[in-house]
């Protein structure tokens, strides 16, 4: 049975990375350093901009995070692709939360816009995922729009985030 709560702690997210949260057949989050959130604060099957599901998660920012030391030296900024990956991670996590089984793979994104940045002086990044559609057939797939905020200010948007769950990824 799926551990279906409305919120998850960092330890819960780490358990997902070990395959312990949604069972051995459920999708896993990546382990640190690629795990891009510290907690999920809200998950619902309704709500969001399309009333088809909503996820909100947070990442605490501090100057010691690994990417600030290498991107860029003397001009530290969180790579935008990590925020995009976090949104894909959350779409896959939601599919596992719904009971989907398989290995999660990002399948694409319609459009991404960056209108701000995450600097080491920031305190918190918030991710908001608004589900548009869930396909639950031979292929399990989530389609969603996402937003990234830093300290409450919208800085990235992504439309048509797609993640699928696969039983076999050898031909992918």
From Swiss-Prot:
Pathway: Lipid metabolism; fatty acid biosynthesis. Its main location: cytoplasm. One of its GO terms (molecular function) is trans-2-decenoyl-acyl-carrier-protein isomerase activity. It comes from the Bacteria. One of its GO terms (biological process) is unsaturated fatty acid biosynthetic process. GO terms for cellular component: cytoplasm. It is found in: Cytoplasm. The active site is at 71. It catalyses: a (3R)-hydroxyacyl-[ACP] = a (2E)-enoyl-[ACP] + H2O; (3R)-hydroxydecanoyl-[ACP] = (2E)-decenoyl-[ACP] + H2O; (2E)-decenoyl-[ACP] = (3Z)-decenoyl-[ACP]. Keywords: Cytoplasm, Fatty acid biosynthesis, Fatty acid metabolism, Isomerase, Lipid biosynthesis, Lipid metabolism, Lyase. Its EC number is 4.2.1.59, 5.3.3.14. Coiled coil: none annotated. Necessary for the introduction of cis unsaturation into fatty acids. Catalyzes the dehydration of (3R)-3-hydroxydecanoyl-ACP to E-(2)-decenoyl-ACP and then its isomerization to Z-(3)-decenoyl-ACP. Can catalyze the dehydratase reaction for beta-hydroxyacyl-ACPs with saturated chain lengths up to 16:0, being most active on intermediate chain length. Homodimer. PANTHER family: 3-HYDROXYACYL-[ACYL-CARRIER-PROTEIN] DEHYDRATASE (PTHR30272), 3-HYDROXYDECANOYL-[ACYL-CARRIER-PROTEIN] DEHYDRATASE (PTHR30272:SF8). Belongs to the thioester dehydratase family. FabA subfamily. This is 3-hydroxydecanoyl-[acyl-carrier-protein] dehydratase.
